[in-house]
């Protein structure tokens, strides 16, 4: 592992780039001419600068995206934790197919710098394996990229030649997880956030070690707040203890599960239900994009609302809904909308969904 940035270089598809090479490449390229490759050069230029800090952007899934200043030293520690856990070694080929504006993409590059990995880059798209011809040791994707890859036989075959795949940035539904269980690749779901510089825990999705629970890295200590949200003490990657908005359960062996976000807890008639849990129950039965949100209600406090994108098969019969959900989980309103609001990273934009439901109710 190389922690001195002055001694680091990037192996990019077999070619070695030094700090001086990066300066030259940035000077002779333009964003229009070089696209994603130019973004990579600009990130490397920022990485090799004298500043010990980088600025990263949060996804904004529960509100307005914000800028965070993070320490490069802590990003390198995060990279070390992942590389050691997954057994990544110098010369291993790893795929960068996620945007560099966010921490997930940046950390793929930092892992390559710290561990001497060979970085294979593809412009972020829904089909990252479309033209990856070399076997990969490691790849990181969002659920939609994995889903799309599994629908195309040639891309699925390429994915199956990858040793390790981590999936983050969104929920993995039951149908996709069932497909993943059949893959020969070691596949993990990640838990983390921008504030923890990518993931601090992993959950194996297939093979004999498959589990429904996340296991934190050895240097991470977890507890629960008075509101049953996860509290993270990860001194290698975060200077302060982080109280999250994720409602969780922690088990005696140190593993944990996430029930949903506190922001997405709906208090309806004095009973708390989680938007994510309702979505998980309905997902196998819904043929169009949808989301659960809520609106204020004089009698219940909050009323559960189902937003459904307009489509021929959008409606789920009320009888089936009653069969699947408890009376408190059952939507009191079903609204047909043009599109489910999403963030730049493809997550449900919860704040926008709530506003959409409020606007619709006011208009009605």
Which sequence ranges carry the predicted segments?
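AMP-binding/adenylate-forming core of the ANL superfamily
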Residues: 221-243, 247-249, 255, 309
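AMP-binding/adenylate-forming
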Residues: 71-77, 93-148
């Amino acid at each position: 592992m190389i922690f001195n940035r002055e001694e680091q270089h990037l192996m990019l598809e077999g070619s070695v780039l030094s700090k001086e090479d990066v300066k030259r490449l940035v000077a002779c390229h333009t964003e229009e001419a070089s696209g994603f490759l130019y973004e990579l050069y600009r990130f490397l230029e920022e990485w090799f600068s004298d500043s010990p800090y980088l600025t990263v952007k949060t996804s904004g899934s529960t509100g307005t995206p914000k800028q965070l200043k993070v320490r490069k030293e802590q990003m390198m520690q995060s990279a070390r934790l992942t590389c050691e856990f997954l057994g990544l070694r110098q010369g291993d080929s790893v795929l960068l197919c996620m945007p560099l504006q966010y921490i997930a993409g940046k950390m793929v590059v930092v892992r390559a710098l710290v561990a001497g990995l060979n970085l294979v880059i593809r412009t972020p798209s829904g089909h990252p394996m479309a033209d990856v011809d070399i076997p990969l040791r490691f790849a990181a994707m969002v659920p939609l990229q994995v889903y799309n890859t599994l629908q195309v036989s040639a891309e699925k075959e390429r994915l199956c030649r990858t040793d390790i795949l981590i999936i983050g940035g969104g929920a993995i539904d039951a149908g996709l997880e069932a497909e993943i269980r059949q893959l020969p690749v070691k596949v993990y779901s990640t838990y983390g956030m921008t504030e923890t510089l990518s993931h601090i825990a992993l959950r194996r999705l297939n093979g004999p070690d498959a589990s429904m629970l996340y296991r934190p890295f050895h240097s991470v200590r977890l507890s629960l707040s008075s509101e049953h949200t996860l509290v993270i003490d990860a001194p290698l990657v975060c200077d302060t203890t982080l109280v999250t908005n994720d409602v969780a359960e922690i088990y005696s062996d140190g593993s944990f599960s996430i029930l949903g976000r506190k922001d997405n807890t709906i208090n309806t008639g004095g009973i708390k239900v989680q938007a994510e849990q309702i979505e998980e129950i309905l997902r196998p039965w819904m043929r169009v994009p949808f989301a659960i949100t809520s609106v204020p209600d004089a009698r219940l406090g909050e009323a559960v609302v189902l937003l459904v994108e307009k489509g021929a098969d959008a409606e789920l019969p009320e009888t089936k809904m009653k069969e699947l959900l408890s009376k408190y989980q059952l939507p009191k309103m079903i609204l047909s909308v043009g599109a489910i609001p999403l963030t730049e990273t493809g997550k449900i934009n919860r704040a926008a969904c709530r506003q959409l439901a409020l606007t619709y109710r006011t208009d009605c």
